[in-house]
Amino acid sequence: MNRDHFLKEGRRFLLSILLLLAFQGAVAAVISDMSVELTTDKARYNPGQTVQLTATGNIPQNTMVRYRHGATVVEEQPFHSLAQDNKWSWTPPAIDFRGYLVELYHKVGSDEVILGTIAVDVSSDWKRFPRYGFVADFNNYSGTVDKDANIRTEMAYLNRLHINGVQFQDWHWKHHQPVKFESNGTPSQWYQDISKRYIGTRYIKKYIDVQHSYGMKSIFYNLCYGAWEDAVSDGVKKEWGLFKRDNSGNYVQDCHELKDWASDIYLQVPGNSDWQEYMKARNEEVYTNYKFDGFQIDQLGDRGTLYDYNHNTVYLPDGFTSFINAMKASRPEKSLIMNAVHDYGAERIARTGNVDFCYNEVWGGNGHEQFSHLYDVIRNNDRYGDHQLQTVFAAYMNYDKAFEGGSGDKLMNTPGVLLTDAVMFALGGAHIEMGDHMLCREYFPAASLAMTDELKTAMIRYYDFMTAYQNLLRGISSKAASSLKVETTAGNVTVSAWPPRANAIVSFSKNVENHQVVHLLNFRGTSDLSWRDVNGTRTKPTLTENLPLTVTTNRTINKVWAATPDNIGGAVQELAFTQQNGKVSFTVPSLQYWTMVVLESENIEEQLLMTGEAVQRDGYGAYDLHQAVPLKRSDDGLTFTVTTHLKGNKYFKFTNGTDWATCTSFNAEYSGYKFNNSNRSTTVNLLINGSNDYKFMVDADGDYDVIVDLSQLRLKVVKAGESQVKVVLPDELPQETISIFDLRGRAVSCEQYLNGTLPRGIYILKQNGMSRKIIIR
């Protein structure tokens, strides 16, 4: 044998060793039993609060309790040494805004058999991960119904779904007079709402008390501009009204007609300060007599051209902003949520900074009917709220089937509901759908369609999944959405990147720190790409098992795992994988509606490079990635920094590698974003592989400190030597001339403002009698 042969064989041997090292060996099988039901005592826990758990079912002697955050095992204990009468407690780590999955399992040989799972949410504020439900029936029907028992049963189920906020729909008397009083000034025990339904005050209060015992928030509903026909007799002025012009050109008050109900709804100018003062007083009566935690504000969408009493044109979204701010100023400690019907006013609502999250009532026929439109809503909301607000959809399933009392089997269609929830949850949204029934119409009391037991159980699994993995699903906004290339060698399966495609598996990916998360959404067997399933005819997607996948990434992957709400209660399934030449290969055990695959690496990014015509290296703009400027990675891997020369008014961006075929870009949120050194506004969002390849600029040539925070996807660029300045607003004001307050009216240190250490948020700055809103990002 000659020398070349030995070299060739040596290279082949070395390659085989490398491949062997790259292969992550077989892992234990995870088997579904799910015969044990688990419950917790609350829907949400504050950091440091103890969780009380109960198991119901046959529990083998060798059963273990395991607590996971993602795939990481936080704690593990033998069940029978821990539990008394199948009840036990657990105190999670005192870390805020975290989701956990509790797994009950036992081993059979080397395999793990999952007996039951349940999620735990540790969050000091519900708005970080809102899971919104509703109630809409407050009647005992003349004693024929044990309403107290029903309330306990309904709220126990919502607690099992980890619903942490509940909207009270159509609970009030008149829209302009929500609390009805007797002649002696005490609240009426019974009254009729606008649809002439009977409402029992004690049942409203009972719901609130039970919800509070579960750690839920109770939110009352009302329009921002609604009044009954007799409102003038209750102190509402005609001059506050909202007017339209009829076919003859006459000005008539706009109203929402409700045939055969107690009254039509006559609309007021929401921005009218006298109307706002009137409603503040009415809301104070609400808060005085009921322990509500906030106000769900409603509207009726775009009403066309509108006028005030003096025939001035009214732009409703401006009025929404004014109304929200007035309600917040009146009761700053209370939650506010406002409906963006058909997306109307969504941007103005979110930009107030005074709503807990974005709430979008979406419909067909207005650009929101397709699955793809759901992501558009989330992405837009993220931008409007500076990536600080979550999105909750009001989206009514099986709408036509539910018309006028329902048709056919009068059941919610399980495949339609589950595929829509799978998409919404995978994209980072939530869905208000669960209450004393499942929503199918915009009139919440309408319970036209019932849920099957199969659907009720599936909802538990889906809400467990959304809660347990909330940090991966909703921990960072759509700016972290990436474009990972996902391929399969299965000949009869098509894998397509978002947006949805008929008869394909669709992948949606997101980078969450050192996790690359790939959501597989199953559209096999369907050509209907509308989320609505209006007639309840959607069938189950084609079950796909043992699906071979390859993901292209230039991260070094050290673990791959999968989880699905459709199997094994969402438990983690670690997957064997190989990695070679930037491609990670593994097999997904099953995909029914939705499976999440997570690729974990040691670091968020192993390198980061600055590229573009603004970057000067060897005299040339660094479009050639080998000419790009490398940034220095911090010890914790969360930030990258560099001081470099940049040309003014020329573009730059960031990449995580030197091969355009495999690297990821980090872009600007808006086209041609320019860092303005005259006002030194320095910190902005980064987007991963944005739909548009937007880049950044500086306004003048010079040396700049560049700091990239990958954990928050924020970019900071300042003139070299000024990087200690976090945010400085346009005017350099002497300390003694200004005062600053938060939105609750509490004074804030001027020194914090001047040295750039104010926390992110919205503040009111007052100078020489003038006030303005400032945003610290």
Regions found by a protein language model. Give the residues of each.
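Aromatic/acidic polysaccharide-binding cleft in carbohydrate-active enzymes
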Residues: 389-477
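Aromatic-rich carbohydrate-binding modules that target alpha-glucans
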Residues: 604-647, 657-680
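Carbohydrate-binding surface patches
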Residues: 492-555, 592-595
